[in-house]
Amino acid sequence: MDILLANPRGFCAGVNRAIQIVDRALELFGAPIYVRHEVVHNRHVVEDLRARGAIFVEELDEVPDAATVIFSAHGVPIAVREHAAARGLSVFDATCPLVTKVHMEVKKYSRDGMEMVLIGHAGHPEVEGTMGQVEEGMMYLVSNVSDVATLAPRNPDKLAYITQTTLSMDDTAEVIVALRSRFPLIEGPKKDDICYATQNRQDAVKSLAPDVDILLVVGAPNSSNSSRLAELGTRLGTQTHLIEDAQQLRREWFEGVGKIGISAGASAPESLVQEIMDTLRGWGARVPQEMPGVEEKVTFSLPLALIQAQTRREGA
């Protein structure tokens, strides 16, 4: 069996930044450090940080007074920021800068008196954070083309759309076409809201999937971008499995298989890919082959407040 590795795969700049923020906070302030929601959607990453003293909570009411709290990469509603400020909590924001970009678009449209349509998945923390940037009733959530048909904005001539950053590019394009067809004056962002890492990983799977007999996507089931990769592989007609780690591999999947493709969602560490390859090689697979792909050079700086805290400590 041959193993073909999608490129790029795994951690994106926003995930790297979020994990570094928790790491640095633990180093500077010691445990416990509170994190609102899983900092990224990967059980292995969360368990590692938890073992080092991070405490993951869903609401700020679970955070004691005078504690340090970190907001996850997915972003938070304005009300959460206000709650933290009112309590005087020490906050470091791990919101991905590309999610923050969407929030800034929301604020601009809101200042212009426009209602908004958010293309996204109900219940996802990024969607909750984005919808929480405006008053209730100012933003409508749609997940697919069918949802567009039932939209009833108060003023169809003053409407804008934004998107969750981790969606299927193809599905989102179809929804945007439906929105523009029904609301010809609808405005949208100058640059696509779907993040570069999501686009690159989907493009890599599109290139890889037709050439393999089975595709493994490494990622958590609650990871939006990982789930979209698995859906894409299936849509392209390739037997596809979304797995969290090597323990979820099943030997019978590979009976009669000649080529195995492997990709990984933006919140999946490369160590998990390596463990999966080790297991497959134990079952007779050959040395993995890296496929050509886009080289990602994007990096995001840490929050200024965290950098300043480290500078003060080093100067003490």
Swiss-Prot record:
Named cofactor requirement(s): [4Fe-4S] cluster
Top-level EC class: oxidoreductase
Catalytic site: 126 (proton donor)
Assigned EC number: 1.17.7.4
Residues bound to (2E)-4-hydroxy-3-methylbut-2-enyl diphosphate: 41, 74, 124, 165, 223-225, 267
Cofactor binding remark: Binds 1 [4Fe-4S] cluster per subunit.
Key words of the record: 4Fe-4S, Iron, Iron-sulfur, Isoprene biosynthesis, Metal-binding, Oxidoreductase
Annotated binding of [4Fe-4S] cluster, by residue: 12, 96, 195
Gene Ontology annotations of biological process type: dimethylallyl diphosphate biosynthetic process; isopentenyl diphosphate biosynthetic process, methylerythritol 4-phosphate pathway; terpenoid biosynthetic process
GO molecular function: 4 iron, 4 sulfur cluster binding; 4-hydroxy-3-methylbut-2-enyl diphosphate reductase activity; metal ion binding
Pathway note: Isoprenoid biosynthesis; dimethylallyl diphosphate biosynthesis; dimethylallyl diphosphate from (2E)-4-hydroxy-3-methylbutenyl diphosphate: step 1/1; Isoprenoid biosynthesis; isopentenyl diphosphate biosynthesis via DXP pathway; isopentenyl diphosphate from 1-deoxy-D-xylulose 5-phosphate: step 6/6
InterPro entries: LytB/IspH
Source superkingdom: Bacteria
Any Pfam family hit: LYTB
Binding site for isopentenyl diphosphate: 41, 74, 124, 223-225, 267
Family the entry assigns: Belongs to the IspH family.
Record function comment: Catalyzes the conversion of 1-hydroxy-2-methyl-2-(E)-butenyl 4-diphosphate (HMBPP) into a mixture of isopentenyl diphosphate (IPP) and dimethylallyl diphosphate (DMAPP). Acts in the terminal step of the DOXP/MEP pathway for isoprenoid precursor biosynthesis.
Stored HAMAP family: IspH (MF_00191)
Protein name: 4-hydroxy-3-methylbut-2-enyl diphosphate reductase
